[in-house]
Amino acid sequence: MTPVVHCSVGNISLFHIGSFRPSHEIQIRRFRSTERYSRVPSRRLLQPQRAFNLISIYKRSSWSSARRPRTLSAATVGTDVTVEDPNPPPSGETSEESSEDTAPDTAEASEQAEASTSSIPKAGRNIRKSEMPPLNDEDLVPGASFTGKVRSIKPFGVFVDIGAFTEGLVHISRVSDGFVKDISSLFTVGQEVSVRLVEANKETGRISLTMRTGGDYVKPKTETPKAASGGRNTTATTSRGSPRQTRERDEAKSMGETNYVQGQFLDGVVKNSTRAGSFVTLPDGSEGFLPREEEAVALFTLIGHSALEVGQQVRVKVLNVVRGQVTLTMKEGEDDEEDLASLNTQLKQGWSRGTNAFELAFRRNKEISAFLDQREKIIVPDVQEAAVASVGTELDAEVGIEQSPGKEPETGNAESVAIDSSITEVKETDSIAAVEKDSEISKTESVETASSVVISEDDSTVDGKLVEPTASVSATETEIKEDSSEGSVTTEPTEAASTEFVTAVVEESAPTASSVETSEDDSTVDDKLVEPTASVSATEAESKEDSSEGSVASTESVTAVVEESAPVSSVAIEVPAPEASEASAQEIIEDSTTVEGAADDQTVESDSPPPEGVELSSNGAPDSSIAEDKPDEPEESLIVEEVPVTASSESEDKEPAAVPEEVAASSEKTADVAVAGAEASTATATISPALVKQLREATGAGMMDCKKALAESGGDIEKAQEFLRKKGLAAADKRAGRATAEGRIGSYIHDSRIGVLIEVNCETDFVSRGDIFKELVDDLAMQVAACPQVQYISLDDVPEEVMKKETELEMQREDLLSKPEQIRSKIVEGRVKKRLGEYALLEQPFIKNDKVTISEWVKQTIATIGENMKVNRFVRYNLGEGLEKRSQDFAAEVAAQTAAKAPPAAPPKDDKPEETAETEEKKPAVAISAALVKQLRDETGAGMMDCKKALAETGGDIQQAQEFLRKKGLSSADKKSSRLTAEGLIGAYIHDNRIGCMIEINSETDFVARNEKFKELVNDLAMQVVACPQVEYVSIEDIPESVVIKEKEIEMQREDLQSKPENIREKIVEGRISKRLGVLALLEQPFIKDDSKTVKDLVKETIATLGENIKVRRFTRYTLGEN
């Protein structure tokens, strides 16, 4: 219940703040009548029941503070404020009656309240006091600059007083052009700043300011008229949603609105392109989506690239409109096929399907290529009708000939040519399709159509093919008549050619095709077999002469038998791409007679008693064969390559026996050319770009030089390298700079006496950098160091001869004799595996956990990381292994040295005092200070007495003293080089975990091996090996004699030596060999830290400094991923 406090001037009601909604805004609610009123009966003693709100409500977020009271005071001045009864009357009549009764009194009270409120100032917010000059509303123009003072600093910005109706806010994003982290560090209260106006809204009482240099102010909004009653704007009350909700509603309204209809053509500009399609800007500024599959050029869709570019003008059609989103297309339906055809024509320009150099050369000529492409266009239906008509005419003629067997042909000695080219392709329709080409085209091109019959212009002979409707047997009757060529002897026009017998047997129902072409001027037969899916049995054609009757059979039926029960159908027409060979291209230019194509079997026979023929083998060479006299027996052969063979025709008046010999001779000549071209094309085809790249990386030679070298060497990399070296184009055995495998190279050195270098591979570089993989490599290296018997990685790496030897030894053991024969092999296998397992690393128990083997531990690591890992290789060094240490007897050595020095010291007794006297007289001449000796000792590392003596000899000159000590040290080093070195150090250097080296350097005693100078030498030489990938040997003496001989032979064959005199060639070769071999030797390399001296000089200087012999014994270098 709300309490009411009565006072002399009015009533004060107290409201609890919990009844109000918290807000950060300041709202002023003016007078608002809540209900209608009427006259009030005079019997009422209290003030009229008038409910009105003349309440100034101030709600701020700071009211939630605990310091302020939790009540809200609402007061009215100059009038009485009453609160409606919390228990209103239940009946509506009473309320109406009371309202009517109180109406006149309420009106009077309201008049008095208005008079009082007009005379007394309103209670509200205090007027802000500004220290800046006042500004008019007309001055508040966006972009205008003002000077103000900072009034307060907030985390989100600063409030600045510019003298306007309120303080302006400079947001933290507008304080500076850059990023502002702490705004309090930039401003202080009272600081004068220069700002620019962004926006001033007097309705909301807000001013936005900026201190940025850019123009980020906005245009002022147009004021909307207020409500006549003095309340809030009607538009503000109607839209109570947030700006985001309002924007979503506006977008939803405009989503379904569009000005386009389906099927409308538009011109647009490509805005951008994605994998799914392209976005096109339409004329009204909206965007439409063009899917990739709806582009006009569909070919690029197949390979995943679009033909459209950003900014390109396109002509599109509206495919559909869904919820305001327009989907476009560039396809017009009927024009798609034409677009694809034109695209294929453009793409085929400059492209050839030829397999040899001659065809490629012709195809590069635009005129010849256009002519050849034009000839491919063949009208199939007209040719089919002509071929069917000609077949019917030929069949009638054949029937007439068979009815008159007594009539003999005019030419008794007729030749028979059997050609294996009549193979039919079985389809589902019962029709015959044949393709006719004119004779002019048949001169210059090989057979392009499969399953076609080409008829000459004189129509003297017709190739007919008959397919019976029973669809089980197809009968084909073919007659070939040869016209005399220009270079041959012509015959009488009335002379008739003998009839040839052709029997074609197709053993399978697979689609096949053949063509027989007879030209006008040539007697050539172009035969081409196309077999895409199944094997085709050979056909055999024979000519049989009946000498006993004295006549030659004019015609016999020619049948083609299909052994399968599949329905026999039409002969389909295929137009494959022309494949011209080297020989055929040359024949085209010369207009000579050609026979092209490769059938399964082709036999040319004569009517002589032993019939001979020419048969094409797989490489195109002619083989003579004797045909059998059984015309009905088919002969099997294989499908061979299409190797063109040319053969000149023979005139009809020549002797039949001479025909096969001349044909065979011509075929052999042409076959040699074809074989040579085939070998050249095969050699060229085997040289792949990958092979050229490999040779180029290995030698550093040019690309064309590498290609030529591979062609000369038949694709052999080693021979190609020798060829390049003979030409002086590359340095042999150059290694590739990069390897492909990932992984890590690790090392483990135990007490500088046992060393291990190991390479472990993984799949990715990310895993190789992980801690788990690093730990694996280090543990495996330690495992190898702890197992001296380990020689192999796994049992699979054990050589076969070792396995056989162990198996033989186990089979000879006596305890196996009592075992059954069946289980002996298993017992032996188990023993051999256990025996050889001691030499395999993966079979060893892990040194950190002997319950698992190395193999199991690697598998666990693979399961943890999720990548495959493999131990590729390792090497293990034991210091001094293979060297014999001599027993040192110091007493004997001293006695031997004394005995060796005594005899030479005895003779010069008389001269010695004079020399010593002279030296004693010379010594005081040069004053050698201790500081000079110390300086020389620090620079050279020599002994104190040696430095003093060197300075005395050189007169105190430091540089000459250093040269003196160096010469003396080198001479002493040469003398000490013959001493045995069995001690020393094993060192390793790993560069970026991808290149590693392990090296062993020996010294005479372990005392020198522990010296810091010696350790530094070992580390420097290990780094030297890593920096020189071409180094393979320690010194030139370690290079095998076979390598030296081979290098000498290569150098002697170099072309630049041929012009040199004989007497100096040998010296030039020796110099080149020494230089070449010096690249392979470590001691001949320039030192990486000082290239003025070689590694050999560095070792000698160390020998002179330490006083013992030092020898580089061996080293091993690993590169990650190399074979």
From Swiss-Prot:
Chain intervals with Basic and acidic residues compositional bias: 245-254, 908-923
InterPro entries on file: EF-Ts_dimer_sf (IPR036402), NA-bd_OB-fold (IPR012340), S1_domain (IPR003029), Transl_elong_EFTs/EF1B (IPR001816), Transl_elong_EFTs/EF1B_dimer (IPR014039), Transl_elong_Ts_CS (IPR018101), UBA-like_sf (IPR009060)
Main location: plastid
HAMAP family for the chain: EF_Ts
Stretches assigned to the S1 motif domain: 143-212, 263-331
Segments of skewed composition (Low complexity): 106-119, 551-587, 657-670, 894-903
NCBIfam families for this protein: tsf
Record's subcellular location: Plastid, Chloroplast
SUPFAM superfamilies registered for this protein in UniProt: Elongation factor Ts (EF-Ts), dimerisation domain, Nucleic acid-binding proteins, UBA-like
Region Disordered, annotated ranges: 68-141, 213-258, 443-670, 894-923
Transit peptide: 1-73
CDD domains, alphabetized: UBA_EF-Ts
Gene Ontology molecular-function annotations: mRNA binding; translation elongation factor activity; translation elongation factor binding
Pfam annotation, one family: EF_TS
GO BP of this protein: mitochondrial translational elongation
Keyword set, alphabetical order: Chloroplast, Elongation factor, Plastid, Protein biosynthesis, Repeat, Transit peptide
Keyword set includes Protein transport: no
Biased composition (Polar residues): 231-244, 486-501
Bias-annotated ranges (Acidic residues): 94-103, 630-639
Gene Ontology cellular component annotations, sorted alphabetically: chloroplast; chloroplast ribosome; mitochondrion
Name of the protein this chain belongs to: Polyprotein of EF-Ts, chloroplastic
